[in-house]
């Protein structure tokens, strides 16, 4: 499929190569026999969640784009529509997980969440495993009504031979809040795009994301927060590690449109480079169609500081242990937001394994 994905809302100089995802990030062609059945999935739905027969009729596009959204809906081999009634607060997280393998190499999921007025819920999505040319493609749509609080945690622990697409679309009501935690640690190709529409007053969107790119990995991200209601707030913060010949593009857009009086938006990225052959590109963008707004963006790129490394080694740490310490410091704020302890431990172990593998290389 050759559709344009992860399009920057306002294009910049073409030579920068950040206006949209590269050709290597394109969605896969649909096999003649289809993608086959989904892998065996584990679903944990605490009391208070209801399964619906159908999702939303119309919805805002994700960060990846409307064409990709339509493709994901059409080709999904696993569909889950969830709803929580007005005033219901659910303390235990719902967990949806899948594991790719040779027999079931493709997981294409379509998930919708309808959080009614003053409800509260947490949804955890996990994908693991891998298969040659395996595909993990996910579209999640969240509607948070007035006063609702929704937390979405997405953890990707795929092998390097799999490919990953993760699209998120969010609509918030008055005083609603959606928090997204996105952890992308594997897959040879990882394409993610989140788009939140804060068109009601006092809506809030928070994104905490981490990524790990190694070898010849291709990582492409596009996160957008659209503000039209007044007193809206978004916080988008990303931390990443790149090694080998990994190629990464991150687009972060805060779009203040007319009517977004007293809107506030902050975005930042902190990248640690372990190799001189990586390619790291970041395109922070703040669009202002309203005067009384506050927007800030920051990007930090660093390598292993030789002085810090010497200090840590003088305290008895090996270089591999020092690397792990520096990565842990960057990833910990996001990992700590995973509400399932066993999954937090699994993520930490996966990060350590990937770092050890890089140090051996």
Which functions belong to the PLM regions below?
Residues 1-39:
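Short, Gly/Pro- and small/polar-rich lid/capping loops
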Residues 44-57:
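Solvent-exposed edge beta-strands and adjacent loop segments
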Residues 2, 42, 49, 93, ...:
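Generic N-terminal initiation segments characterized by hydrophobic and/or small/turn-forming residues
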Residues 59-317, 331, 338-361:
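Conserved beta-strand/loop scaffold segments within soluble protein domains that form the structured core
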